[in-house]
């Protein structure tokens, strides 16, 4: 049983490294105006996370549009606003599909 656990931990570490590499590639390709290749890299990284049954890393989760699957670079293909109408939150709008994300801001004590 210990051997299986070690194998799973090792494979999850490899999967995390590959996800990071693919997401960095997606970021570079989007800056070079290659949107389709960037979407393919995002899709591949999501498939790796699903196959390994692990959650997608939080640092990358908010950089992907949940509607169209494109990688978001703030100011280039997405806009970011801070609103405080009913509650304080960050509004991220994907400029490709016009999908809106709201991320609540926790108040510090």
Curated annotation (Swiss-Prot):
This protein's GO CC annotations: cytoplasm; ribonuclease P complex
E.C. number: 3.1.26.5
One of the record's GO molecular function terms: ribonuclease P activity
Record has Cell inner membrane as a keyword: no
Species this protein is from: Methanococcus vannielii (strain ATCC 35089 / DSM 1224 / JCM 13029 / OCM 148 / SB)
Sites where the protein binds Zn(2+): 65, 68, 94, 97
Gene: rnp4
GO biological process: tRNA 5'-leader removal
Protein name: Ribonuclease P protein component 4
Family, similarity comment: Belongs to the eukaryotic/archaeal RNase P protein component 4 family.
Major localisation: cytoplasm
One Pfam family recorded for the sequence: Rpr2
Database matches in PANTHER family: RIBONUCLEASE P PROTEIN SUBUNIT P21, RIBONUCLEASE P SUBUNIT P21
Keywords in alphabetical order: Cytoplasm, Endonuclease, Hydrolase, Metal-binding, Nuclease, tRNA processing, Zinc
Cofactor, how bound (note): Binds 1 zinc ion per subunit.
Reactions catalysed according to its record: Endonucleolytic cleavage of RNA, removing 5'-extranucleotides from tRNA precursor
InterPro entries: RNP4 (IPR016432), Rpr2/Snm1/Rpp21 (IPR007175)
Cofactor(s) needed: Zn(2+)
